[in-house]
Amino acid sequence: MTTYLLKRLIIAAVTLVLASMVVFAVMEILPGDPARLMLGFNASTDQVELLRNQMGLNAPLVLRYLHWAGGLLSLDFGRSYTYSVPVIDLVRERVVVSLPLALIALALSTAIAIPVGLFSASRQGRAGDTLAMGAAQLGVAVPNFWFALMLIYLFAVWLRLVPAGGFPGWSAGIWPAVKSLLLPAVALAMPQAAILARVARSALIEVLNEDYIRTARAKGLPYRAVLWRHALRNAMIPVLTILGLQFAFLLAGTIIIENVFYLPGLGRLVFQAITQRDLIVVESVVMLLVAAVIAVNLLVDFSYAVVDPRLRGRQ
């Protein structure tokens, strides 16, 4: 088990290094000059070059990458070109919106998908199965930004149950803050819940055809007990894998959803930084998101042995 953990940690470290190179290279390839955007198009060439020197943009590419990557290791993300404040301060302000949003969406998608998958698998081929999987297919097909707009119209404009957008801050109280995150979380969660429900159904159907399930039924165990105690636990490996991947999709989806709902989170910060060519903000925030995704997937890998003890010996 120790060898397995060490191997996974090494793979995670290599992945982080490669991801940092890709992120840095992509941002360098994108058109636009941050110094020119900051000074305006009426600025002279000398003024632009002076600012580029001050910002370190004229240094060799390799040196700039090493300086940036070294700063990441020491949690020194540099200063924003646009806001003229440390990037870490911007992250602290925005992560208190994005992280709860992603966690609420993940909890919602799991709470919806697992019961739907159980229901559908236990009624394979029947009308309930067809209806549930049809709804799941629709959930996968509908774009989350369109679904978000429909939620705003229904619950904010028509029923007036929740705010249409914005975030009051946690200082306004837990319920007002959570209330403002409900619609965005539902918009993020539904497509992921649809995917997870289909995966859970497939895994459960495969497990329900195993010999030990038939043996448990033959011994007289109630079908519900067999389904929840035996089948679900053994079907959790693919479900956990998808959950780890979904966390990445949820973080990426916040870029769209936070702009639809006008939430001051990391997604909106990245979007604004891209339009303003604030390279240091984009690179640093994207790498933080990459690190978060890798950490979550490491936890998923480690949880396999907890869910299925048979894997401990193999690992």
What are these regions (language model features)?
Residues 26, 30, 38, 42-43, ...:
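Hydrophobic aliphatic residues
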Residues 2-4, 13-16, 89-130, 144, ...:
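Alpha-helical transmembrane segments of integral membrane proteins
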Residues 35, 74, 147-148, 183, ...:
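Alpha-helical transmembrane segments and their lipid-water interface positions
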Residues 22-29, 59, 70, 134-165, ...:
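Membrane-water interface segments at the C-terminal ends of transmembrane alpha-helices
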Residues 36-39, 63, 78-81, 147-148, ...:
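Short, hydrophobic secondary-structure boundary micro-motifs
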